A protein has these predicted regions:
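Catalytic cores of eukaryotic secretory-pathway lumenal/extracellular enzymes that build
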Residues: 2-246
Length: 246
């Protein structure tokens, strides 16, 4: 089994415990998992003891989760999962994520699973693409849940990356740590393809919205975004595909 790094930002160890425990207890191959936390301040001595007892866990003190922070925490794992304290995992989740990555209708090595994971009380219970809702006059792109993938046979390619969830080869982190700018545009320019996960193998205790993104008019990738998804920043218009998320 290939090694998987689970990356998570949390206020403290207590906030992360339930999600990490859910990931570990429901994994088919627990020994293939390693864990990395980004914390706003150093843990207390009792917290460090609990973290050490949990298993292969390391941490970094940083005010925010950035790709540079992720790269620092990476220790050679082949795959990386950006996780959130609100996540809860179903049985054999890592096997299912790997299968979904292989099922992406793009080159496996360049695919990135993402999307709005469903909340546990969601009546539909499907993953939704990250879709464009509108472009404000100041160049701010606002996001919304796209069309739920209730019957999709495989992950669906799309333009946008959820900032709290992705699963990909670890090379994605290393590539994204270089450079700056809007994450989904940087991924697009570098040849990575975001794909909405088609099976809800992870659910959430509450919905995680995608914050608006202020896009600079000179950012790389805007022409490609317009051509492939009909999101036109110059005109401030969105295509049907942009509003669906795929």
């Amino acid at each position: 089994m290939e090694r998987i790094l689970i990356l998570m930002q949390a206020a403290n160890w207590a906030e992360a415990t339930e999600a990490l425990t859910s990931a570990r207890e429901n994994a088919l191959h627990r020994n293939a998992l390693s864990y990395a936390l980004v914390l706003p301040e150093a843990p207390t001595s009792p917290e460090e003891c609990n973290m050490a007892a949990f298993g292969a866990l390391r941490y970094l003190v940083s005010p925010e989760m950035t790709f540079a922070a992720m790269e620092t925490l990476w220790h050679g794992e082949r795959y990386a999962l950006l996780a959130h304290p609100a996540m809860r995992f179903e049985r054999d989740w890592e096997k299912k994520l790997l299968r979904a990555l292989n099922d992406c209708p793009v080159e496996n090595a360049q695919a990135v699973l993402t999307g709005y994971l469903p909340a546990q009380d969601d009546p539909i219970g499907a993953v939704c693409p990250v879709a464009a809702e509108r472009i404000d006059p100041d160049g701010t792109l606002c996001f919304a849940h796209g069309m739920p993938l209730t019957l999709a046979a495989h992950p669906m390619p799309g333009a946008f990356l959820h900032p709290d969830f992705f699963f990909a080869r670890a090379g994605f982190i290393r590539a994204m740590a270089q450079g700056s700018g809007t994450a989904f545009l940087r991924a697009m320019v570098q040849g990575w393809q975001c794909c909405t996960l088609n099976q809800p193998v992870i659910t959430l205790t509450h919905d995680l919205p995608v914050p608006p993104a202020r896009i600079a008019p000179q950012e790389d990738g805007l022409a490609q975004l317009k051509e492939e998804y009909g999101v036109d920043f110059a005109a401030g218009t969105l295509s049907a595909a942009g509003k669906r998320g795929f």
